[in-house]
């Protein structure tokens, strides 16, 4: 059998432990849509900062903790900023793109080599700090700049949203960590786990 016949029979080979581009694009698109929908459909406005409480962090953490930094970062940033843009909060969209993107990326980067609950908890905490601190700094600057308020007024208004943001990420972690563990467990039962999840420390894909 020639080399060409072998390729024709088996198809292109995918290096073990690496996601295929098709899977990456598909999962990214799905989670970008889920982040956007969960952010847009479940909102509680916060008048003091012109922002809103939402459930998007649940999906951001699920995508990052389960599928790593690329998918977590893209879906978090793009999905959340799209929701801002179409939901009447377009002035916040650039801040959201960066902050929520970093939230998903950091959580995914820390958790990508291990699936232990301890590492997932650390990854969630790091992503949460990025989100809460990022919005505090952005809103402090934005409120003072747009409304012509003093720096103190901007900080005071941004501080009013901190408890809501903390509640948002805590709720996201409570849901996302067990869901991520469950998704990984189900995927690992297949013969293609490393092609979906990517390489994980201490995990060997099941051989078919």
Which residues does each predicted region cover?
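Loop-helix junctions at membrane interfaces
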Residues: 1-208
């Amino acid at each position: 059998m020639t080399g060409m016949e072998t390729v024709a029979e088996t198809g292109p080979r995918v290096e073990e432990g690496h996601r295929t581009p098709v899977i990456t694009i598909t999962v990214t698109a799905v989670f970008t849509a889920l982040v956007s929908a969960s952010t847009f459909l479940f909102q509680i406005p916060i008048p003091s900062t012109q922002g809103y409480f939402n459930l998007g962090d649940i999906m951001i953490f699920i995508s990052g903790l389960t599928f790593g930094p690329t998918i977590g970062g893209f879906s978090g940033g793009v999905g959340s900023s799209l929701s801002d843009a179409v939901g009447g909060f377009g002035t916040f969209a650039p801040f959201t793109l960066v902050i929520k993107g970093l939230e998903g990326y950091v959580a995914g980067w820390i958790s990508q080599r291990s699936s232990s609950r301890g590492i997932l908890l650390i990854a969630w905490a790091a992503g949460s700090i990025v989100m809460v601190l990022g919005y505090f700094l952005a809103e402090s600057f934005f409120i003072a700049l747009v409304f012509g308020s003093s720096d103190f007024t901007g900080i005071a208004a941004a501080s009013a949203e901190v408890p809501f943001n903390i509640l948002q990420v805590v709720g996201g972690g409570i849901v996302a960590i067990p869901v991520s563990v469950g998704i990984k467990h189900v995927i690992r039962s297949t013969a293609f786990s490393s092609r979906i999840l990517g390489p994980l420390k201490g995990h060997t894909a099941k051989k078919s």
